[in-house]
Amino acid sequence: MTGPVIQGWCPGALRPMMSGDGLVVRVRPRNNSLTAAQAEGLAAAASRHGNGYLSLSNRANINIRGVKPETHPDLIADLDAETEARRNILVNPIRAHFFDDADSHPNVALADALADALAAADAPRLPGKFGFVVDLDRGLRELAHDVGDIRIESADTGWKDFILRADGMPTGRLVTRETAAGLAIEMARWFVDSGGVGADGRGRMRDHIARGARPPAGLSGDVAPARPAIPPKPGPRGGGTLVAFAFGQVRAEKFAWLAKAGGSIQITPWRMIYFSSGYKVRRELMFDRDFITSSDDPLLRVVACTGAPGCPQACRETRMFARQIAPWVPRGATAHISGCAKGCAHPGKADFALTATPEGYRGARNATAAEAAAAEAAIALDPHDLETWLNHTAAPEKA
């Protein structure tokens, strides 16, 4: 079996990636936020130039799939894409309510300053997947489990304290609103100058640290980050509402409606959307099958990539299979259905990993997609084997 092709870059708006159903164009909203007008425009672009769906990524980006090469220039004309390739900043989506003005919240202010610095002519040239995290709220870290190479995050010394921390280091140095962005750029420049970027143009901070690199004294410290927040689930949170979608995919018209209902929306790295909502809107969401508003929905227990035929590297269809498996996955567990060994939808281990191969699905417990594909004990699966393999004897729940 030929191994999957590992790309060192993500399909940004100006540099799309070809897939089985056309180009994949990734949009990085500034501060992971969209006004109602911006969301409606993006939805219209997805309907006009793509397949009519918007896919949410685990980097709080939005993918438009099915774009024809000949219409890609028209899509770019509809987007403000000139600087998005250099803006890879993940922002805490939950607004803290002890700040009077959301626009003056330190998450927004610091992310804006960081984006401006990255757009400067003298900014360091970073690998395509290299990213920043801005995670400041209430002495907690909403993004503690989300990937980021350079992190500006709440400290454990007090709810107003922030630290700058290189991913892979257990502690960081205290920073302020005024100094954080500049020091983050200095850390990025140190990463490049100290050999963090390989000959192939790739590089991640955690790997650099694991190889023995250490930030200089001015970019390191002994302050620990704040404790992680409770893992996010669909439903009310922080004065707003988190809404999920099966496999992180939402129809364009529903995306636009959600933004209009909330006034604006935050794209999260949890493949959910966060927005302000009243009781009437939440009630409408509950009765619309396009939205997932309950944390008990079985579809939240499965993760699946695009699969075949949308992805040329996938050996088989994935999402219909994931819908079949969802009712049998035990509560509290996660099943990862991957079209190939790359495991794009869920890079880490899952309680149940099922990976498509030319011979069929192969599975392993507490494994990555690659481990499931390669494990000696992996077994060929079809939908009729799932109940036994998952060791879940209760009647399936309605998905």
Indicate residue ranges for each PLM-predicted region:
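Short, low-complexity, intrinsically disordered N-terminal peptides in bacterial proteins
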Residues: M1-G8, N391-A399
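Intrinsically disordered, low-complexity polar/charged tails and linkers
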Residues: M1-P16, I230-P231
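Small-residue-enriched alpha-helical segments and adjacent helix-cap loops
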Residues: T2-G3, S19-R165, P170, L174, ...
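Residues that cap or delimit alpha-helices
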Residues: K68, A210-R214, D382
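An acidic, glycine-/histidine-flanked metal-binding catalytic module
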Residues: E153-A229, Q266-I267, G360-R362, E371-A374, ...
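Cofactor-/ligand-binding subdomain signature composed of acidic, glycine-rich
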Residues: G235-R237
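Short Fe-S-cluster ligation motifs
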Residues: H336-K349, G363-P396
